[in-house]
A protein has these predicted regions:
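Bacterial N-terminal signal peptides that target proteins for export
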Residues: 1-8
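Bacterial N-terminal signal peptides
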Residues: 9-16
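Sec/Tat signal peptide C-region and signal peptidase I cleavage site
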Residues: 18-22
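Short N-terminal segments immediately surrounding and downstream of signal-peptide cleavage
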Residues: 23-38
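Short, solvent-exposed loop/turn elements at domain surfaces
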Residues: 39-40, 163
Length: 214
């Protein structure tokens, strides 16, 4: 479900960090969710993170929708007293993020362009892990993958891609575990999408974004 991107609720942390660094922020409320509020600084902070990770940002309206989704997941996880990731898990997540860039130089350059510190990034990764781990825990047991689904994915995706690259595809048995997990993750995303849609319909939400930002 674009979990690179439920881009999980680091925006308030970044907004607070920006204020403590003395940056000039003109803040205003852009949404009310139940008894909580979402600020323009949170939308801006998530946009900076998207710029860092993807090299581009969504519209403020789409970012606000993501923040509302994050609120839903975070509220559920906090209510369930779901455990936060360990320091080792966070460090591993930061390492994986760094490895997703072509080079250390590109990572540092994009980090600087986005105005993020190492502490910002660690906070982002920690919260992203917290929320994605919660969704995994909540929905994994409901996802069942039939053997034929694995075989179909192998033929339609793995074999087709290998042929397009003029490469020999890996054996099905060697790919089975990877394919199984990919299909489980897709199922979790689908379950989470449905749950979020149902949850949003029950929420009291008021948005105050200007028309041009939607």
């Amino acid at each position: 479900m674009r979990w690179k991107t439920i881009l999980l609720s680091i925006a308030p942390l970044l907004a607070a960090e920006a204020l403590t660094r003395g940056q000039e922020l003109i803040d205003r409320m852009v949404a009310r969710v139940e008894n909580d509020i979402i600020l323009q600084s949170e939308v801006s902070a998530l946009g900076h993170y998207q710029q860092f990770v993807d090299g581009k940002t969504e519209s403020d309206g789409k970012i606000l929708d993501r923040l509302i989704d994050q609120w839903i997941v975070r509220n559920e996880a906090d209510t369930a007293r779901f455990p936060h990731p360990s320091d080792a898990e966070v460090a591993h997540g930061v390492g994986r993020l760094q490895a997703s860039f072509a080079s250390t130089e590109e990572y540092e350059s994009r980090k600087k362009q986005a105005g993020l510190s190492d502490l910002d990034i660690r906070a982002m990764v920690a919260m992203q892990l917290y929320l994605s781990n919660y969704l995994n825990s909540r929905f994994r047991s409901a996802v069942q993958i039939a053997p034929k689904e694995v075989e179909d994915f192998y033929q339609d995706a793995v074999v087709t891609r290998a042929k397009a690259r003029n490469q020999a595809p890996p054996a099905l048995d060697a790919s089975r575990e990877y394919i199984q997990e990919a299909l489980v993750q897709r199922g979790i995303n689908e379950q989470a999408d449905r749950w979020l849609k149902e949850s949003r319909a029950r929420l009291r939400v008021a948005k105050f974004l200007s028309e041009g930002a939607k």
